[in-house]
Amino acid sequence: FSVDYVNNKYASNIYGALQVDRKVVEVNADVKINEGMENFTIAHELGHIVLHVPKMDKNKMTECDFDSISKDNVVEKEADIFAACLLMPESNVKEAFYQIRNSRLLLKDNFIFRLIGRGSKRKRALNFASKIIKQGNFKVSKYAMINRLIGLGLIKGLRYQKNNVNSRV
């Protein structure tokens, strides 16, 4: 498989797609994403190649729309988990985390925090994720790191975060 950057093909909410018949991962060049999101997009599509392409009907291998294959998005979640584990190995994340903190981070919605300018749980999580990314030299988005920290049980009190390109944080 190779990686191609394509214009004028996908909607702005599609970062990447897999062209199975051509053995190409396509990245939507029309969407301005940072390096971390680009890395995650490519790793996500690689997850589909490893986890899902071997199970596909060989006679129907064209553009792969995994969203339509799975109504409950299990396939997409599996590709996300694959990408997270590939780009942010558990041992590396924990090492970076424990160099900054000695215990799990419990985020509470606290009126006092908002008064003194420390912001919402989401904002505090984004700031903390930025520190972990820098400490561990990870090349991922803040949202990807937050979700990995949640998945590893290192952040409590926050649900998985959906990345939104249009909200520049």
Which sequence ranges carry the predicted segments?
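Active-site hotspot residues in diverse enzymes, especially metal/ion-binding acidic/histidine motifs
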Residues: 1-169
